[in-house]
Amino acid sequence: MRILVTGATGKVGQSCIAEILQSSNFENASIVALCHNRNLNSTNRIKVIKGSIADQNTVTAALEGITHVIHLATCKETPEAVMDVTVKGLFWLLEECRQSSTFEHFILVGGDASMGHFFYDHSIPVTETQRHTAYPGCYALSKVLEEVMLEQYQIQYDFPGTCLRAPWIMEKDDFKFSLSFGKDVFGGPVWRDLVDENEADQYHKDGTIPLMLDSKDVPIKRNFVHVDDLVTAILCTILNPVPAKGQTFNICMDEPVDYGQVSKYLKKTRNIESVPVKTKYCSTWLDNTKAKFLLDWSPEVSLHELIDRSWNYLRDGEDARKIWYPG
């Protein structure tokens, strides 16, 4: 088994490669890591190729002898690059794979941005049969285009592909910093933009967290997945190619994160205060039943564990927080 990992230096890529290399199920597997902005070290089981998936020659070289592709490379809110990566890059990958004599399975890690994340009011849980509803911006649109391109290759060529649709992916202290009123906030909303500036500074100083509310003052439920659970789903997909072929799976926690429960738990366990913040966003519930049924996969990181892991995580001097992309 020879596995190409695009976006290999990201949080999912690095975790996935590490798990493959230590798993007894993949002891004969080798990795080709396609890197762009950052780099990895080559080993006897990892070959590193530097370049862009938008370049056909780079893709052709990276896919030589490949049996499986784990496609993680993506763009956030970068209009100048998003179509090169999302459309052109994915097209070259799919074209080269379908003509390859060694290729067996293509795994796309998509995003629930293709379903609107928490921008739209879905009256029922979001399943894999619901139509695409991208929220404003080029990133969400790119997630729709990825899924549609893979789906059409499955129709056109009976292409052996699987889409794993993930919501916001957490690792290390990501969740803690997603609740910061400071300029160090991870992702969105940017909480300090939703309150008075002086209040935001005081909340940040005190360690107070936001309790996100919808337009009716009800705590919002928002979908997340821990990187460990996503990696497990990726490996389950490789090991279960028959039920996975041609399918899309929601890969997420069993229940969305309830910001009301987050506030209660952090107050109870760490005496952390919260302040309600009214927003334009909506509660959603991403349904992962299909992945449980067909892949025999189940997430292990619960709400309380997600919180505890994030607050307990200690960074050393070589592990500074850095955001590699806008959006």
Give residue spans per PLM region.
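Conserved Rossmann-fold NAD(P)-dependent oxidoreductase catalytic core, especially the SDR/UDP-sugar
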Residues: 92-137
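Glycine/proline-rich active-site loop of Rossmann-fold NAD(P)-dependent oxidoreductases
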Residues: 156-159, 171-197, 215, 237-249
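Mid/C-terminal beta-alpha module of Rossmann-like enzyme folds, strongest
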Residues: 221, 231-279
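Catalytic helix-loop patch of NAD(P)-dependent Rossmann-fold dehydrogenases
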Residues: 121-163
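N-terminal Rossmann NAD(P)H-binding glycine-rich loop of SDR-like oxidoreductase domains
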Residues: 3-26
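Conserved C-terminal active-site "lid" loop/helix of NAD(P)H-dependent oxidoreductases
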Residues: 227, 260, 278-298, 319-321
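Amphipathic terminal alpha-helices
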Residues: 303-327
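NAD(P)H-binding glycine-rich loop region in Rossmannoid oxidoreductase-like domains
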Residues: 40-42, 50-88
